[in-house]
Amino acid sequence: IQWQDGNGTGYHINIVDTPGHADFGGEVERVMSMVDSVLLLVDAVDGPMPQTRFVTQKAFSQGLKPIVVVNKIDRPGARPDWVIDQIFDLFDNLGATDEQLDFPIIYCSALNGIAGMDPEALADNMDPMFQAIVDIVEPPKVEVDGPFQMQISALDYNSYVGVIGLGRIKRGSVKPNQQISVISVDGTTR
């Protein structure tokens, strides 16, 4: 997502969705290895679901600090205070650190594209959520000048372009159509 703050500063924010169910544990772990933080999306009426526990545990095991997003805040019966209490209890039961227990909260209606730091004072857009991401999440630490290195989290194949690697750049940079080598764990190059 390309986003510009109120001062005109532009940001590129990568948002990666992950399945919420334990049945997709491997996929969740792959996604967690590519991110610097997590947006934990929780319904303003229902609160944390059983699968929330699984995904949150994976985030904590990676040392990530969640940003809690209470969605559907405009829904009849929304109970944000109860939801936040439930999230705090969940985090505590999962052994969250003090830093993880001091989680930021954003309230939103994703369907209506509105967000805010207070459930009673939402902006007419999602800017408060993006601003919170920019303010809270540190940019990735990448050695831009070094030789290209990417941690591959998943491989795919396309008959037109060949092997497609999804992952996180750890060092250097890559340009469109640039040829690269894939080095396997055993050192073989392809």
What is each residue range found by the language model?
Residues I1, V31, A59, F91:
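Short hydrophobic alpha-helical segments of the AMP-binding
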Residues T52, P80-I87, M126, F130:
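Amphipathic alpha-helical segments in well-structured domains
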Residues F91-R190:
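Conserved catalytic-core segments of large NTP-driven translation/proteostasis enzymes
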